[in-house]
Amino acid sequence: GMYSIRRKREFCIYDNLIATSFIQDVINYLNREELDVPISAGVSELFNMDDEKIKNLYIKEIELDKFHGFVGKTVIHPKQVEIVQALSSITYEDYMDAQDIIKNYNSQIGVKKSSSGDKMNEYKPHYKWAKKIMSLAYIYGVLNKGVDYNELIKSKK
């Protein structure tokens, strides 16, 4: 591309300062209230998911994509699909928190301990997040209580 950079297999996209600066600009622009455009995370050219190091780095990158507000991820190889789909599913804990936040949005209290008991659900600040979680739950599904994405991508040997 423009900067003559190609990622090495030891790094995820967030380890590159130029890429993270661009990603930040895209998110800040497209995630504004008046636009609220869902943004798919960028592609990773590494697809040998039989290599545990590459697979774990890919998972880390998808987790960071989600943390930064991306929805889904562009895939270039069939071996990437199962991992992206598994990590796109909504955890039971997030689903329960989102339901609680939406249900209590107009509450006089404003904040309550989450159903898991380890964090606070702030109704006004987390409302937009909760709506997004509910939409994604409808699309990708919700994991059962006590189950995480690893159950969906266990090796099929």
Regions inferred by a protein language model and the residue ranges of each:
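Expand to "…catalyze enediolate/carbanion chemistry for C-C bond making/breaking, isomerization
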Residues: 1-157
